[in-house]
Structures are given as C-alpha cells and as structure tokens.
Amino acid sequence: MRFGVGLPVAHHPVPEWASSLEAITAVTRAAAAAGFEHVFVTDHPAPPQRWLAAGGHSSLDPFVALTAAVAADPDIRVLTNLSVLGYRHPLVLAKSAATLDRISGGRLTLGVGVGYLAAEFDALGVSFDERNDRFDHALDVLDAVWRGQGVEITEGDGRTSVVLPDPPPVQQPIPIWIGGNAGRTRQRVAERAQGWMPMPNPAAFAKTTRSPVLDGPDDLSRFIADLHRRVDEAGRDDPIDIVFVVPDGGQPGSAGFQADVHRRAIDECAALGVTGNNVTLDTTSLEHTLDVIGRYGADVIGARSS
C-alpha cells in the first residue's frame, strides 16, 4: 500500500499560508519524511461561484504547484488529482506534463478525469456535452506525442504538417491514472491506463458528481472485480494501480479522526486489491499541517509496516 497526500490548497479561497513556495516545500518534505510516496494537487482553473458557495474549492494550478514540490525533495513523486482533460488543448497538456516529468527526472503520474462541472466547461469555452469525446481524443494525442509519433495538423493554407512537442518525457510513458466510478472509466483503464482512482461517492452526491454511487466495501469490491474482468478481456497482464480515498475514521487533522479505524479500513481495502490511499487533510495552518502529516506517518503508515 502506497500513500499520497494533497497539498492543502484545495479551499476557497486558497489560503495564503498554504500557497507560498516555502509552504509547498515544507509540506512536501514533511510528506516524504512521513513515508508518503507522492503529493497531489487538484485542478479547477475556473470554478463557478455557485459551486464554490455550496462548498466547492479553488486550487493552485497543478502543474506549477507540483513543479515546486519536485524541487523540494529528490525522491517524492507528484500526481495531478485530477486533471480534467477537456479543460486544456491536448497538445498543451502533453507539453506541460512532459515538462514536469523532465524537470522531476521522471516522477509525474498524470491523474485525469472527464469532469462534471458544466459551468466550468462553459467558462473555458469548451462543450460539456462533448467531454467524453474530448477525453478520448486527448488520450490519443498524449500517446502519439509521448511515443514520438506526433500529431498531423492541417495549416491555414491547406498544407499538412506534423506537430511533435519537445522535449519528450523521461518516463515512457508517463503513468496515467483515470478517476471515476463509471463502467466506461474502468473500460478506459483496462484498455489504456496504468491506474484507476475510484472515489467515495454516497448517494447524496451522485447527482452532483455525475458518477455512480460508491458507498462502502461492497460497492468497491464489485467495481474492482469488474475492472479485473475488463483487464483480462483486454489481454493485459501488467499491474494496474487502484488508488482510493479511504474515508473511514474521518479526515486526518479533524478533531474526531480515529487512526485505528482508518488503519483497519486501509487493511480491508488492501485485501480487496487497493494498492494506494490518497489522503486529504483538514488543517488550518502550516504548523497544523506539518504536525498532522507527521502523526499520520507514525500512526498509520509506520504502524502498518511495523
């Protein structure tokens, strides 16, 4: 079981104490010392005010923030959790991801999703109804660019040309983890990704997130079995990461967090086939964040390995 922790910037407004270079450096180094494999940042370039008022969050740009993180520690990996593929032109995304992977020496995992906030698509001038087609097209472009094949375009005068952003990434390929609970998501993972990120999704939130309910181990077990079936049908025998957000025991940093309950739930998820746990923190200052990360490392990560 590997662990990741979110940089504490997924708030609205993004707190000043969490968003400086010094804060990102301190949190990343604390995470590495506590035994976390990676740090992550979410992606909301233009969140609608109505969603924010209802409890949504802003964030730093993931590619910029994670570049600061890789400079803070020589070993920790970084994850976009997750980048909505429809928000960016795929050639721009391929360039950003390859640049971060090159700067980090091959430490990026590209977590991606289809997206569910229609108003954010509207703000960016992108068709929400075409998000699935744009997602699949983006995967095609990323694959072609990173393999060195490039993408053929038609210029304004009618001539064709090949576009191949340079430099290429260090990893061949950059691992892609796809987030979401739908069967279509698991099919994409089985055919063309290196990992799957299912999300806890109680029935009360399913309409907002436009994703199937995942509320407990029975749902998770059923979804994992479905993924394995699809992987077998795709003829793959390479390992696929399954990275969850284990909710049991509460949120680290909150007054009611129960490390023992959380740890037992992680063990149960591992028995189902989960290979990683992404942790989001409930913290209110840099000092609080560093303390919670250290205690999680001792009470959860360290306790499981002892």
Predicted regions and their residues:
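Active-site-adjacent structural elements that line small-molecule/cofactor binding pockets in enzymes
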Residues: 1-306
